[in-house]
């Protein structure tokens, strides 16, 4: 078989979608190399049938370990399904000793994890701390994955269907992978150093009130609320540690930059609040989502 076999389909009946996607997968599988690990992502139109879907996957491919998640939309090669009943499958023939599926009911203890694919319920209390703890259990500290998204239950799959907490699959260092990051953002002003901050409140940038810097970058004033509010809603914040390079080629964000939401401003104190705890010394640049920036990132990643 190829390194991976994939399939995808959309249909009001999850059984029909699974049948169509499975036919695509089976056409790529070689009988001498059966799959051992499967990934399933399904839109929330199938959320109520998640248990039945997993049972059907197990019946079709006995012995395969399954991980995955629900989402408002799912993607495959060259196609996206958003807010419609659809699913995506990916199967791999990895040696079983090179991975382990984990969940709250099946912890990672005793496994020599190097990296991990993680799915999580976004409503989980202290999720950030749980991810840090899991990262510390891997040799590389590298986690990738995402949050479940649904209007009908935040299911994630790890040899069972779970809600709450997190689950996924860990890999040994024998599983080689290439990882690239795209933020899809364009800075709208210079990189500045945080010189005064408290929790998630940025008070001063390069010694100047943070809100004053933001308004200058957006070319707007507090006296123009009709112009100001839409621009604030579309503005994000790029953050990096003092020792990390924030900008890469073409004045774009580097791979170590974390993009967070702007969650509020305090005109009286000229303070900006962001969706992350910040510290003096960190680097900050205001930014916005940008289609051309995303395209450039993808070209860079695929080059």
Region roles according to the model:
Residues 1-47, 56-58, 64-65, 69-303:
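Small-residue-enriched flexible segments
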Residues 53:
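Active-site-flanking structural segment that lines cofactor/substrate pockets
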